[in-house]
């Protein structure tokens, strides 16, 4: 195996024996093969699209396959083998539709086929499937930066499609991007595709924002309970709001309460979910605390997307763990996909929850969130007045991911060290590093404004662009906004590329720069966008307050 897609990759170089995430070598190899098959699908899909037809079935498969390979999603090798077989069938179907639109010699990813599990496992171990097959580290870096950004785009696109919102331009780009990694392109062309991935990430996040808000209303300022009730419960983690909706509806009147965990916390901000009295609040912290949080919750647990981490030997919740969608785990029960026009059947997890003890209380009180673009723009006059009066000197965007590395205490310390005339704008699970601190407010405006899930980083971009307009500025970088971003997985890569496409410069990225950036590619990003690693808390806070 060779995997360097997440921030915690071994020695910030790459995992070669077992993933730091816990991913076994065989699982990593099968995920590589699934991407390899997707490249073959994309070759035919791109040609078909150029001829005037976009194959949505193939596009849907590519989105879900890319999503499957995001860190902390897929753990079951048998499921991955089935996905590979399904991908080969999809590829054959697209190939038949493309017909003479594809000609000439084709790469192995467009022709290799097998239905035999042993042969599939052997292929997953072959050199041609490895990332490291490309000897030129700069080409490899640009290809992987593109693919990893596409994984984030695919995840957001899949969520939007579940709610009935789709754009063929996004699907077409994913095929173009994957197909491009099988071609000999110039460095300039590859950089162009990486920037197009940023543009597509903006489009995907905008589409998902439209899907979520049209379906569930605009997030609003909300005090979220972090204590517990007296009934048994279901803890729902991940990002899928459709699953949240159906679970709340099916648990109503059953005596089973529902709590969010991790990135599902922002579900508490949506008006549509507030009518459910058995929706109690949020339990626990960010994803990497789940071994402890899931244990003390006592009830049933539903993983709708990443992040699911391996169960430890002393954990007892495996028989209470349920997965759904693209998530899977060996030995865990799985809730199947919804039938066309229907809902998922959550009765197995509801019945399991009824047999469980109520959650153990681990904290009490409330946290405040719901500051997506619609809510913040409703407060625009108040915010603008605070900036003009000097009450707010600077905004610091601290969106992104949380993770296990001790060095991530930097983000807590920055939040604590920032002057009291600064406001933190956040989205994603990075918020858990500071959203329970008592940082106060500025004239009634909380000093931590949580927009929501990682995809709601789109809201932070909308807010910045609106402030640019209000203050009559020509450049988004002239705003009193600094960016101190925490990254972990591939959705954060998509968000980073989106910010770069929007012209944002001077982003601090930590706790380490990505291992998949070669020195040359990292140099390009530094020269063109002034991306920089994090430094010491004192130095970075001083620099940000000076607009550097």
Swiss-Prot record:
Superkingdom of source: Bacteria
The reaction(s) this protein catalyses: A + NH4(+) + H2O = hydroxylamine + AH2 + H(+)
Principal location: cytoplasm
Positions of post-translational Cysteine persulfide modification: 401
A Gene Ontology BP annotation from the UniProt entry: response to hydrogen peroxide
Subcellular location: Cytoplasm
Keyword Electron transport (UniProt): no
The keyword 4Fe-4S is annotated on this UniProt entry: yes
Annotated positions binding hybrid [4Fe-2O-2S] cluster: 239, 263, 307, 401, 429, 454, 489, 491
NCBIfam families: hybrid_clust, PRK05290.1
PANTHER family hit by this protein: HYDROXYLAMINE REDUCTASE
Protein name in UniProt: Hydroxylamine reductase
């Amino acid at each position: 195996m060779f995997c360097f897609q997440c921030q915690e990759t071994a020695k910030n170089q790459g995992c070669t024996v077992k993933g730091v995430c816990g991913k076994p070598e065989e699982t990593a190899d099968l995920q590589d093969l699934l991407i390899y098959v997707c490249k073959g699908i994309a070759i035919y899909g791109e040609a078909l699209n150029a001829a005037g037809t976009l194959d949505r079935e193939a596009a849907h498969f590519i989105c879900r396959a890319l999503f499957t390979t995001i860190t902390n999603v897929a753990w079951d090798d048998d499921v991955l083998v089935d996905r590979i077989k399904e991908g080969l069938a999809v590829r054959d179907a697209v190939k038949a539709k493309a017909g003479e639109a594809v000609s000439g010699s084709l790469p192995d990813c467009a022709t290799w086929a097998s239905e035999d599990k042993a042969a599939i496992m052997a292929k997953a171990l072959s050199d041609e499937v490895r990332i490291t097959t490309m000897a030129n580290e700069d080409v490899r870096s640009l290809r992987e930066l593109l693919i990893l950004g596409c994984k984030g785009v695919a995840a957001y696109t899949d969520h939007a499609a579940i709610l009935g919102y789709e754009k063929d331009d996004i699907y077409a780009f994913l095929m173009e991007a994957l197909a491009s990694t099988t071609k000999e392109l110039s460095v300039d062309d590859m950089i162009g595709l990486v920037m197009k991935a940023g543009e597509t990430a903006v489009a995907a996040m905008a589409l998902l924002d439209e899907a979520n808000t049209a379906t569930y209303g605009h997030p609003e300022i909300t005090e979220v309970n972090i204590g517990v009730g007296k009934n048994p419960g279901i803890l729902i983690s991940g990002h899928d709001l459709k699953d949240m909706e159906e679970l709340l509806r099916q648990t109503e009147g059953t005596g089973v309460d529902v709590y969010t965990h991790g990135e599902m916390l922002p579900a508490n901000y949506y008006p549509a979910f507030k009518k459910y009295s058995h929706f109690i609040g949020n339990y626990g912290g960010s994803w990497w605390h789940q071994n402890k949080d899931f244990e003390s919750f006592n009830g049933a647990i539903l993983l709708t997307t990443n992040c699911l981490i391996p169960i430890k030997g002393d954990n007892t919740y495996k028989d209470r763990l349920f997965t759904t969608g693209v998530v899977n785990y060996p030995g865990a029960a799985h809730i199947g996909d919804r039938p066309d026009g229907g809902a998922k059947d959550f009765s197995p997890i509801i019945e399991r929850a009824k047999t469980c003890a109520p959650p153990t209380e681990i904290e009490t009180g409330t946290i405040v969130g719901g500051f997506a673009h619609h809510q913040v723009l409703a407060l625009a006059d108040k915010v603008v007045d605070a900036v003009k009066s000097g009450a707010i000197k600077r905004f610091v965007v601290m969106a992104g991911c949380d993770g296990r590395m001790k060095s991530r205490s930097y983000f807590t310390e920055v939040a604590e060290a920032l002057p009291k005339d600064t406001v933190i704008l956040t989205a994603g699970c990075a918020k858990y590093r500071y959203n329970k601190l008592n940082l106060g407010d500025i004239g009634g405006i909380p000093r931590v404004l949580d927009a929501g899930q990682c995809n709601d980083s789109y809201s932070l971009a909308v807010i910045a662009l609106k402030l640019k307009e209000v203050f009559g500025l020509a450049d988004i970088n002239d705003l009193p906004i600094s960016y101190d971003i925490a990254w972990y997985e591939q959705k954060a890569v998509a968000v980073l590329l989106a910010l770069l496409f929007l012209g944002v410069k001077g982003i601090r990225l930590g706790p380490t720069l990505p291992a998949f950036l070669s020195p040359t590619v990292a140099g390009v990003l530094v020269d063109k966008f002034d991306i920089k690693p994090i430094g010491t808390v004192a130095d970075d806070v001083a620099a940000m307050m000076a607009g550097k």
